[in-house]
Amino acid sequence: MADITAVSAVYFDKVKTRLRMRSTSLDDEIESHIVACREDMLRLGINAETAADENNMIVLAAIRAYTLWQFSSEMEIAERSRRDYRDMVDDLRKHAGYGDAG
């Protein structure tokens, strides 16, 4: 089973860049949201290998949307990011090989 808690520095930077944060003060929180997102993907039916795949651009986009949803102070952006995240995970789940049933 893939380790969904392992986040490479390069992957972390890709997510953090989307949040437009330069400070390192929230790095631990950002990383915890990446892991929480992966755990949520498992709960929603995505297999662990897919959730932990740092080369899958759809998964990266979903994780970026999730973290933006969690960090945004603007309700409109947060809600749009939440919908984007849920839509991407739902699409992944429906395709063979990505979901637990796939």
Annotated model-derived regions:
Residues T50-M75:
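Mid-chain, well-packed structural core segment of small domains
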Residues M1-V59, D90-G102:
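Conserved short "hinge" loops at termini or chain/domain junctions
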Residues W69-D91:
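C-terminal structural segments of small proteins and small subunits
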